[in-house]
């Protein structure tokens, strides 16, 4: 992710135009446009990761409630005819190399890609970094609250429903919540899907800020691929994915209220910039 991008007004440090603004709730001194110092950003990211790990790996006390919530989600999806998880799970499991690849995709890419996009954003778009990063961190914190107060089991935990735990069946290390390490991880942190939050954030960031068309296309395809993977591996319901998308949207809304500026440039302005030589 090293392509050059022509700076927008925000990237060059100039304040956005005042028309149609929402907020800001924060005073000007708490919403600078320049990127933060690297050591401070690493510390904040480390604290967020520590909170994520602590909450994500805390074994919930209400296992029965988590399973009941999962059964309720599955029943509701059946009523609404959006229960595609079982079909996708079984179809992917029939192709050995595909499902093994999906297991490793599920285990690794949400960390690797998100960190990569954060680094690219910090280096190439310093004027956008704070706003876009704030939306991601806010959405992640909201997801952690969901894990703590709305523990939900993944589809593969629903006995008698026919879901395949693809990590166990294919003997991969595709998830901390399967196999031999399951006792070390919170297996009821399905709602909302952090995979969807992070992949949608990464995809939007690339789609809005990357200059090269193929990078923008990859950004648009990445959350769709992640959505397929989380269903194929029976780690999330469609509802979990929808909740993840809604959580990210709320993260962007909170960021806008706090700073009074959008995280991304307007589509029209971005298109004009991309068309310039």
What are these regions (language model features)?
Residues 36, 40, 44, 130-135, ...:
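Alpha-helical transmembrane segments of integral membrane proteins
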Residues 51-59, 81, 85, 146, ...:
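Alpha-helical membrane-inserting segments
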Residues 233, 237-277:
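C-terminal membrane module of polytopic membrane proteins
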């Amino acid at each position: 992710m090293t392509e050059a991008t022509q700076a927008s007004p925000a990237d060059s440090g100039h304040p956005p135009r005042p028309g149609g603004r929402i907020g800001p709730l924060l005073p000007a001194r708490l919403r600078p446009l320049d990127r933060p110092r690297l050591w401070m950003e690493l510390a904040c990211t480390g604290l967020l990761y520590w909170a994520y790990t602590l909450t994500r790996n805390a074994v919930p006390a209400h296992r029965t409630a988590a399973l009941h919530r999962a059964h309720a989600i599955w029943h509701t999806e059946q009523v609404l005819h959006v229960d595609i998880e079982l079909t996708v799970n079984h179809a992917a499991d029939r192709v050995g190399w595909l499902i093994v690849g999906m297991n490793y995709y599920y285990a690794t890419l949400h960390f690797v890609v998100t960190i990569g996009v954060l680094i690219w954003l910090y280096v190439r778009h310093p004027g956008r970094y704070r706003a876009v990063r704030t939306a991601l961190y806010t959405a992640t914190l909201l997801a952690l609250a969901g894990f703590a107060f709305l523990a939900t089991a993944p589809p593969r935990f629903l006995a008698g429903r026919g879901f395949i735990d693809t990590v166990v069946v294919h003997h991969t290390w595709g998830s901390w919540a399967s196999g031999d390490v399951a006792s070390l991880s919170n297996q009821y942190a399905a709602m909302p899907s952090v995979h969807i939050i992070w992949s949608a954030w990464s995809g939007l960031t690339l789609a809005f800020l990357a200059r090269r068309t193929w990078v923008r296309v990859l950004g648009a395809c990445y959350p769709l691929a992640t959505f397929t993977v989380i269903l194929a591996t029976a780690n999330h319901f469609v509802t979990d994915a929808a909740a993840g998308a809604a959580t990210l949207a709320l993260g962007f809304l909170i960021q806008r209220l706090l700073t009074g500026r959008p995280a991304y440039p307007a589509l029209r302005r971005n298109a004009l910039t991309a068309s310039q030589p």
